[in-house]
A protein has these predicted regions:
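Two-component/phosphorelay signaling modules centered on CheY-like receiver
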Residues: 3, 12-32
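Helix N-cap/capping motif at the beta->alpha junctions
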Residues: 33-42
Length: 62
């Protein structure tokens, strides 16, 4: 069983690094990414992930 996961961070390099770190865990399936709070809410509502990695400080919405 995989953990359907979303990554949310306004810094592209942070998302890339997190994706790299999670790649060694076959049970983690990254189903989407968002770069801001509004997109994150839409993504989470649409995809209903099991797990979300969230940046706590982002422009517009924290």
């Amino acid at each position: 069983m995989s953990l359907r996961t979303v990554l949310v961070d306004d810094e592209r390099l942070a998302r890339l690094e997190l994706r790299r770190l999670l790649a060694v865990h076959p049970q983690v399936e990254i189903i989407g990414e968002a770069a801001n709070g509004d997109d994150a809410l839409a993504l989470i509502n649409a995809q209903q992930p099991d797990l979300a990695f969230l940046d706590v400080r982002m422009p517009g919405m924290d």
